[in-house]
């Protein structure tokens, strides 16, 4: 991700004063220069759009070739009942622009399948929501080829997931030095500390701060769906406490890849989840029958409160990496709307 950073105007500095105080002038300028593509303006896509538009992103292109339906009205706040039957981007463009007239917005209703490599080359980051899994893998293959970071998010009623592929990302964090100083070296299979520098507090020389540079490596979606495991990454006690949502989400994604368009039965879902439990190294008992039933019933349903949580999490991480702040998420999140757990797994 190599952006040409533009300086902020005095008006922009005044407009974004509060968030500049939070994450700094450089981070805000980075966001002002970023070009982001958002695919599908559903419930999650609407939440992400709202957050990054208000944050002061420079350029946002929304690609959505869907019409507004009555089913959209309960979960998508940019549209109303008067918009049913219209192109979604035609119905929402003025409302989105009103959030922040300063940003450059582009709307595109062309079918995703018609977009070629040249189209994607213009962006610094891609966010894809509510995708068929084969489409997501195809886009991920392309974004990797072009070295473009990618977020993929989807929901099924009370349950949701986020996949992140930043390919390779160097993050910098600063923290107060503890009794045991941070050292260079691997901290997980996907992350390594590559540099640690220190500075003294200007007001208290007894305090030392560490600036930690971390190399984050990511894996493509098709590889995650083929080889994801938690073996040797967690203790036996931790493996027994893994949420049902993880094997069920992976099962649903894998089933969508292999059996596109076909309804999934309880028996099939249970068998697939058991296979994933074995692959992950977790006991099959973590998958509960009532969760399987809920997963099947809620497949493909958008629920506004879940979209708000997932959209907010994705938008925050997008802002972090565009602003080159803090360590990014790495690399697979699931959300359980029943327990409100949202664990992060590193595959």
UniProtKB/Swiss-Prot annotation:
One of its GO terms (biological process) is DNA damage response. There is a cross-link at residue 35 (Glycyl lysine isopeptide (Lys-Gly) (interchain with G-Cter in SUMO)). It comes from the Eukaryota. InterPro entries: ThiF/MoeB/HesA, ThiF_NAD_FAD-bd, Ubiquitin-activating_enz. Keywords: DNA damage, Isopeptide bond, Phosphoprotein, Ubl conjugation. This is DNA damage tolerance protein RHC31. The keyword Cell division does not apply. The modification Phosphoserine is found at residue 9. It comes from Saccharomyces cerevisiae (strain ATCC 204508 / S288c) (Baker's yeast). Present with 7430 molecules/cell in log phase SD medium. Could be involved in a ubiquitin-related process important for DNA damage tolerance. One of its GO terms (cellular component) is nucleus. Pfam families: ThiF. One of its GO terms (molecular function) is ubiquitin-like modifier activating enzyme activity. The keyword Phosphoprotein applies.
């Amino acid at each position: 991700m190599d952006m040409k950073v533009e300086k902020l105007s005095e008006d922009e500095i005044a407009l974004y004063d509060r968030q500049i105080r939070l994450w700094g002038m450089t981070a805000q300028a980075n966001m002002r220069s970023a070009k982001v593509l958002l695919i599908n303006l559903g419930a999650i896509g609407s939440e992400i759009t709202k957050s990054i538009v208000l944050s002061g992103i420079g350029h946002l292109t929304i690609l959505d070739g869907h019409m507004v339906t009555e089913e959209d009205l309960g979960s998508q706040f940019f549209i109303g009942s008067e918009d049913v039957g219209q192109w979604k981007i035609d119905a929402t463009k003025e409302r989105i622009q009103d959030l922040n007239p300063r940003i450059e917005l582009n709307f595109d209703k062309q079918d995703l399948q018609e977009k070629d490599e040249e189209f994607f080359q213009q962006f610094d980051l891609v966010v894809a929501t509510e995708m068929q899994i084969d489409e997501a893998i195809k886009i991920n293959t392309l974004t990797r080829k072009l070295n473009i970071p990618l977020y993929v998010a989807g929901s099924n009623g009370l349950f949701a997931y986020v996949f992140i592929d930043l390919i390779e990302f160097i993050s910098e964090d600063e923290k107060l030095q503890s009794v045991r100083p941070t050292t260079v070296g691997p901290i997980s299979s996907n992350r390594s500390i590559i540099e640690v520098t220190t500075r003294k507090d200007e007001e208290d020389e007894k305090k030392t701060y560490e600036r930690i540079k971390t190399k984050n490596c990511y894996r493509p979606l098709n590889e995650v769906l083929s080889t994801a495991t938690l073996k040797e990454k967690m203790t036996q006690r931790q493996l027994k406490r893994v949420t049902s949502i993880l094997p069920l989400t992976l099962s649903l994604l894998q089933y969508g890849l292999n059996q596109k368009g076909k309804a999934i039965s309880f028996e099939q879902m249970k068998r697939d989840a058991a296979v994933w439990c074995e692959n992950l190294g977790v006991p099959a008992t973590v998958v509960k029958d009532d969760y399987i039933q809920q997963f099947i019933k809620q497949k493909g349903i958008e629920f506004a409160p879940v979209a708000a949580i997932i959209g907010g999490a994705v938008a925050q991480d997008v802002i972090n990496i565009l602003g080159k702040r803090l360590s990014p998420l790495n690399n697979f999140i699931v959300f359980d709307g029943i327990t409100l757990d949202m664990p992060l797994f590193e595959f």
